Amino acid sequence: MQFWKVHGARNDFVLVDETEEEVVPESDKPDFARWACDRRSGVGADGVVFIRSDPPSVEMRIFNRDGSEAEFCGNAARCVVKYVTEVRGENVKILRTLSGAHRVEVQGGWIAVEVPEAEIKKVVELGYEVDAGVPHFVRLTERDPIHDFGGLTDEAKTIFSEYEPKGGVNVTYAAPSVDELRVRTFERGVGWTPACGSGVVAASLVYSEIFGPFEEVSVRTAGGCLRVSLSDGPLLIGRAEIVYKGELRGDWRENTDHQRRRHSLSRSPSGRPRLQECR
């Protein structure tokens, strides 16, 4: 079984191409995601992405580390476009997810993904409820959420627990500065990640609502810089990287109890792992 390791702003994923055939049976996908995302006994990732390409569109499904399925993921979306464009050699114009259809554009090394349904739904006492393909609770903070996020964990878990009866929520902290927004998200089904694409969009909407309006917002995350165009879309703009191609040996189901799992990378003639160069 082949897979690809990819990341967008260090939000990393195991990508499985099911265009030709179903690689992982539907009933096994949650268990596979839990195993594959384990950084000690699996491959290691924040999520698993399954795709089916049908140019000019591609279908994407994203499963979180805990096995739950998410409606949308902005960073995974860019990774899918990168893979289909560079590995499959196909043009992508529409990305289909559980949250709906998203227009995509490739602009040199940058990939733009439209999040047409993004909007502020409700202002509450501690922050803002935002739909950015998935639900977010955006909270402005004076604390730097990139480096000083540990002190926010208890509050993030408390907010999450309040929304758990409704399916949970992604808790996004945003700290405005002079020329950029600094953002970090406690993701539903994952926890803290270096970057959350939908969280970046959600925070940008709130930032523009309070301090704007702005046509574009520059956002810094622990995984790098992203841009959100609010004049058309909105559009989440950033890069994506293909790290390596891997192959699973044996049956992963035998190791869903989190025992050590063997997997191999594509090897160069020297015997070292071959890392695909990102352009």
From Swiss-Prot:
It comes from Methanopyrus kandleri (strain AV19 / DSM 6324 / JCM 9639 / NBRC 100938). This is Diaminopimelate epimerase. The lineage of its organism: Archaea, Methanobacteriati, Methanobacteriota, Methanomada group, Methanopyri. The record marks H136, E187 as: Could be important to modulate the pK values of the two catalytic cysteine residues. It catalyses: (2S,6S)-2,6-diaminopimelate = meso-2,6-diaminopimelate. Its EC number is 5.1.1.7. GO terms for biological process: lysine biosynthetic process via diaminopimelate. Belongs to the diaminopimelate epimerase family. Signal peptide: none annotated. Catalyzes the stereoinversion of LL-2,6-diaminopimelate (L,L-DAP) to meso-diaminopimelate (meso-DAP), a precursor of L-lysine. HAMAP family: DAP_epimerase (MF_00197). It is found in: Cytoplasm. Keywords: Amino-acid biosynthesis, Cytoplasm, Isomerase, Lysine biosynthesis. Substrate binds at N11, N64, G74, N75, N170, E187, R188, G197, S198. The active site is at C73 (proton donor), C196 (proton acceptor). Residues 255-279 are annotated as: Disordered. Pfam families: DAP_epimerase (PF01678). One of its GO terms (molecular function) is diaminopimelate epimerase activity. Pathway: Amino-acid biosynthesis; L-lysine biosynthesis via DAP pathway; DL-2,6-diaminopimelate from LL-2,6-diaminopimelate: step 1/1. Homodimer. PANTHER family: DIAMINOPIMELATE EPIMERASE, DIAMINOPIMELATE EPIMERASE, CHLOROPLASTIC. One of its GO terms (cellular component) is cytosol. InterPro entries: DAP_epimerase_AS, DAP_epimerase_DapF. Its main location: cytoplasm. Gene3D superfamilies: Diaminopimelate Epimerase, Chain A, domain 1.
